[in-house]
Amino acid sequence: AEYSGYLDSATRGTLENARLGINHEPPQDFDFQSGADDDQLATATSLAPVVARYEATPGLAEQVTRATRVRQKHPRSIAYMQIHARLLVELLSGTDLHSAVHRVQETAVQDPEFGPELALRFRDVFERKHLSTIEATAQLGQSCPLKNSFPSALVAVIQTPDDFESTLLRIVAAGGDNAGRAAMAGAWLGAHL
C-alpha cells in the first residue's frame, strides 16, 4: 500500500529526487545526498542523535552536512544545521546556555554565504529577548523557513533556559510551525539541562 498522508516539503522533494521505483526503493546508485531544495526545519528535528554520536570527533561538521543533505540540499539548511549542531555540542560539553549561544554566534557570522544573515538574526534574537515569546515570534517569524524558525526557537530558549516545560508551552502558544521550533528548542534544552 502506498502512503497517502501528509509529507513535509523536504520529504516530498527527497522522494521525488530519489525517483523511487515500482517497489518504492531508490535506484541502486542513489547516494542519499540529494535531498530537497528546502530551507525549513526537517533536519533540525532529527539532528541531535547525529551530534551526540559525533560530537567529540573531528568529522562532526562533515557528518552534519551529510545528514542534512539526506533530506535537504539547500545551502541555508546546511549552514543553519551546522549552527544547530555547534550549539548542541557547546551545551553537551557543559557550557552555560548564554555563553554557548555567544560562542556559536561568533563562528556563525563567519559563514561565507550566510554570515550576514546569521549576524542579523542573532542580533534580532537579542533585541527581542525581553518581549513575550508570542510577540518575539510574531516579529522573527512563525513560519517554517530556518531564517524565521531558528531565531524564534532560540529567543524562547534564551528567555527561560532552565524551564523546559514553560519554554515549550510558550513556543506552542506562539503558533505557526511550533512543532518544528519546539523540536529544535527541546534538543537544546535537553543538552543544556
How would you describe each model-predicted region?
Residues 1-193:
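Structured, active/binding-site neighborhoods that engage oxygen-rich ligands
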